Curated annotation (Swiss-Prot):
Highest rank taxon of the organism: Eukaryota
Any single biological process term in GO: hydrogen peroxide catabolic process
Protein name, UniProt field: Hemoglobin subunit alpha-D
Role of this protein: Involved in oxygen transport from the lung to the various peripheral tissues.
Amino acid sequence: MLGAEETALVRGVWQKVESAKDEMGEETLTRMFLVYPKTKTYFPHFDLHHGSEQIRNHGKKVVTALGNAIQNLDNLRQTLADLSNLHAYNLRVDPVNFKLLAQCFQVVLAVHLGQEYTPEVHVAFDKFLTAVAAVLAEKYR
């Protein structure tokens, strides 16, 4: 999955943005709902307006899960097992949505990092988010 340098890069970047992670979670979901409006179908009970408490709270859950995954890169399957089960069996989320969310998170990360969002950071986070999406989608097979 990630080499030692990429792992260090992902963890280092996460430490830099951790203080803004809740805001980033909200921005990621808001962006996903705007760019990929079909993703809204999984949230029929949410107020999907920009700045809603429900988007803010769910965004916190998303970035908290990403933070846990970063802390447990060597054990992603176990770390994300409950989320994988929830999304596959209870919520029945189409796994393509994990990739859409990852794309939106990359954009938000780039906005927050500015020039520190280097090609190396992009590649490292792309590998990380691809691995997370793959683990979340495993239950669908």
